[in-house]
Amino acid sequence: MTERTLILIKPDGVANGHVGEIISRIERKGLKLVEMDLRTADRATAEKHYEEHKDKPFFGELVDFITSAPLVAGIVEGESAIAAWRQLAGGTHPVEAATPGTIRGDFALTVGENVVHGSDSPESAEREIAIWFPNV
């Protein structure tokens, strides 16, 4: 089934020069990048995006990090795009759960700065795309 999913290349991925390689991996997987924007997220967008974590102790650090520098927000489309992107991204914790060969397994060392984000379900994708790309 053709799906759309939100992807974020977080500030650490942008700052460390991984954007080109990440986009190449998306394309090699057969997914299509249909929207892409380099921006520095404002706090309101970040807080809305991460609202499920608002009562957790790391919420403030998460918002501070995602708004600290430019990131790339994008919409990826393709067959089973959500699962395909999550497979490319690797496990959330880059050392304990991300396999070498995945984006996080290759480029990240901490769970707090783990290079990329991807929606985890069709419902999350719809909600997150509306937050980051309200006119799409």
From Swiss-Prot:
EC number(s) given by UniProt: 2.7.4.6
InterPro entries (alphabetical): NDK-like_dom, NDK-like_dom_sf, Nucleoside_diP_kinase, Nucleoside_diP_kinase_AS
PROSITE patterns per UniProt: NDPK, NDPK_LIKE
Biological processes per GO annotation: CTP biosynthetic process; GTP biosynthetic process; UTP biosynthetic process
Cofactor: Mg(2+)
Location of this chain's protein in the cell: Cytoplasm
GO molecular function: ATP binding; metal ion binding; nucleoside diphosphate kinase activity
Residue numbers binding ATP: K10, F58, R86, T92, R104, N114
Keywords: ATP-binding, Cytoplasm, Kinase, Magnesium, Metal-binding, Nucleotide metabolism, Nucleotide-binding, Phosphoprotein, Transferase
Catalytic activity: a 2'-deoxyribonucleoside 5'-diphosphate + ATP = a 2'-deoxyribonucleoside 5'-triphosphate + ADP; a ribonucleoside 5'-diphosphate + ATP = a ribonucleoside 5'-triphosphate + ADP
Chief place where the protein resides: cytoplasm
Summary of the function given for this chain in its UniProt record: Major role in the synthesis of nucleoside triphosphates other than ATP. The ATP gamma phosphate is transferred to the NDP beta phosphate via a ping-pong mechanism, using a phosphorylated active-site intermediate.
Family affiliation: Belongs to the NDK family.
Name listed for the protein in its UniProt record: Nucleoside diphosphate kinase
Native source species: Corynebacterium urealyticum (strain ATCC 43042 / DSM 7109)
